[in-house]
Amino acid sequence: MNELNKENSIITYIFELGLIKSIDEVKEFMRENSSPYVFNCDEPKTIRFEWFLSEDEKSATLIEMFEDSDAAKLRLENHSASHLVEEFPEHFEIKQFIVLGDIKSDMKEKLADWNADLRGNVAGFFKGID
């Protein structure tokens, strides 16, 4: 994938979130609940799952990256079947959900209820990290 303007299968989720609970509760949810749960899911093509907090600690960003559309779909399915489906909205308000990459039509159907902003790949490169 180390070529300029070559299509790739990588899908990225970017969640922009407002915090509902206290900063301590949110950090605990990120570190002790959400991250360990996803880390231990059987999702071999999930390649990134990282939380970020704004400097004022009033908003958060969650970035998830997958090798392909099928892996991104599996993450949504696992989320929907987990305890996180109820706990996530207790901690965060989704301000924006952006999906980057070329997703399959079955994935578009899954994302319809999420009000996702779908953005297909146009140009650039992905060198990856060794």
Where are these regions (language model features)?
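Short S/T/G/P-rich N-terminal loop/turn motif that feeds into the first structured element of a domain
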Residues: 1-60, 67-78, 90-130
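A short, acidic, amphipathic alpha-helical segment used as a generic capping/interface helix at domain edges
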Residues: 80-86
